[in-house]
A protein has these predicted regions:
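Glycine-rich active-site loop/strand segments that organize a redox cofactor
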Residues: 43-93
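Predominantly flavin-linked oxidoreductase catalytic cores and closely associated redox partners
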Residues: 104-105, 109-174
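N-terminal Rossmann-like FAD-binding beta1-loop-alpha1 element of flavoenzymes
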Residues: 3-27
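An accessory alpha-helical subdomain
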Residues: 73-85, 93-117
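A short beta-to-alpha transition loop/helix N-cap that caps and shapes the active-site region
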Residues: 34-38
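Gly/Ser/Thr-rich beta-alpha loop segments that engage phosphate groups in nucleotides
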Residues: 11-16, 44-46, 162-163
Length: 174
C-alpha cells in the first residue's frame, strides 16, 4: 500500500494531524480504541484547552516553536471547532475548559473529522521494520488481519509518553 502520510499514534495529536494532513493518510495505534487517554482526561470530562494558553508559558530548546505553533492554531480555533460539533463545555479554574457531558464527545469529534478526511484507522496494529528510504518511509503494519507492507512519503510519530501504563501507554518511540 502506498500512501502520503503514515501516523503512528491515535491520541489527540495523531487524530488531529490525520484529520488535517490531506492526501491519503493511514493512522495506526496498538490500542483497541483511539483516544484512550482523552477518554479519561479531566476526570472523564476532558480538559481540552486553556483560555490563557500563551507562548511564554512553554519551555523549549527552540523558544520560537510555541510562538509559531500557537500563532497557527490557537485555543480559540479549537473552541470554535468544539462549538461547530455541538459539544457543550464550561470553564473551570484558571481558564481550563471541560466538556459538560463526556470526554467521549471529543474522541467522537476527532473520529468524525478523520472519517470526513478519508483517513484509514488501523487499531490493535503495530508498526514493524520502519525504514527511511529515498522517497519517504517503508514499514510493515501487523494487526488482527495479518501483516502488510506500506510505503509513505511522510511519517508522523505521535505516540505520546509513557504516563499511564495501565491505559496502554508504552515507551515506544519515547
Amino acid at each position: 500500500m502506498q500512501i502520503d502520510t503514515l501516523i503512528i499514534g491515535a491520541g489527540a495529536a495523531g487524530m488531529m494531524c490525520a484529520a488535517n494532513a490531506g492526501g491519503r493518510v493511514v493512522i495506526v495505534d496498538h490500542a483497541k480504541a483511539p483516544g484512550e487517554k482523552i477518554r479519561i482526561s479531566g476526570g472523564g470530562r476532558c480538559n481540552f484547552t486553556n483560555m490563557h494558553c500563551a507562548p511564554h508559558a512553554f519551555l523549549s530548546q527552540n523558544p520560537h516553536f510555541a510562538k509559531s505553533a500557537l500563532a497557527r492554531y490557537t485555543q480559540w480555533d479549537f473552541v470554535e471547532l468544539v462549538d461547530q460539533h455541538g459539544i457543550k463545555w464550561h470553564e473551570k479554574t484558571l481558564g481550563q475548559l471541560f466538556c459538560d457531558v463526556s470526554a467521549k464527545e471529543i474522541v467522537a469529534m476527532l473520529r468524525t473529522l478523520m472519517q470526513d478526511a478519508g483517513v484509514e484507522l488501523h487499531l490493535q496494529t503495530s508498526v514493524e521494520n520502519l525504514i527511511k528510504t529515498e522517497s519517504g518511509y517503508s514499514a510493515v503494519l501487523t494487526g488482527p488481519n495479518g501483516s502488510k507492507p506500506i510505503t509513505a512519503k511522510n511519517l508522523v510519530v505521535a505516540t505520546g509518553g509513557k504516563s499511564i501504563p495501565k491505559m496502554g501507554a508504552t515507551g515506544f518511540a519515547y
